[in-house]
Amino acid sequence: ILTGPNPHIGIQLLDELHLLQEILPEVSNMKGVRQPENFHPEGDVFVHTLLCLSKLVPATEQGMERPSFPLAMGVLLHDIGKTVTFEELDRIRFNLHEKVGAYMTAKICDRLKTSNAEKERIIWLVLKHLYFKDAQKMRLNKLKRLFANEGYPELAELCRIDALASSGDLSDYHFCQEMFSKLSHEEIKPKPLITGHDLIVMGLKPGPLFKDILTKIEEEQLDGNLTTKEAALKEVRTLISQMKTVLK
C-alpha cells in the first residue's frame, strides 16, 4: 500500500473500512488533532499526513524508482507524536513530538515485525524530521554528521514532502541539498586525525575522557578548524591542560 501508487488512497480506504483503527490505531488517532493554521493551512494531522503520502509518487522522480519502505513509513509516522503532545495554551504546541513519535514508532515497528535495519531507519527519520528547520543555523560539524548518515537522502525527501504538504517553504531543503552537493565524501566523512591509540601514547588511560576528547577533536575537524594530526595533538594537549586546571 505505502510504496505503490496512491498510498494516500490506500490509507483512506483502510480508514473507511474501519481497518486502520485495528492495524494502526496511532495513525487513526491523528484524525481531529488540530494544527496551527499559519503553519498548517491544509488541516489536521491526519489530513496533513495523507497530503504527504500523496506526494510520495512524485518523489520517485528524485532518483528512486519507487519510495523505499522506510521512507514511506517515515512519511506516514513522522507526526505521530502530535497525537499525545497536543497542547493549547497561548497557541497550539506539540513539544518534543519528534522524540515521542520516535518512541511510538519503535513500538509500531515491533508490532509489525519490521527488520531491525528498517526499524532503525524509520525511527531515525521520525526523530530527525525537524532537523532541516534549524539547518541554516547549525554548525558545519553537525550538518556533516547529518549528511554522513546513509539515510540522509530519505530524510531530505521526507523534509521536502513535509514542507510541500504544509507551508510550501522549501528554503531549508534547498539549503541542505546545496550544502550536501558542495561537500565531497572526504569532507563529510574524513579519516580521523587521531585515534584512541594516540591518546594512550600521550599517557592517557582509556576511559570516559577518551570519548569526550575524540568527539571534540572530530567536531573541530568537521568544522575545518583542524586539518593535520599535529594540530589535533596540540589541541589535545590544550584540552588536557584545561581539564587539569578545572580539577585543581
Predicted regions and their residues:
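Conserved, hydrophobic alpha-helical core segments of structured domains
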Residues: 1-160
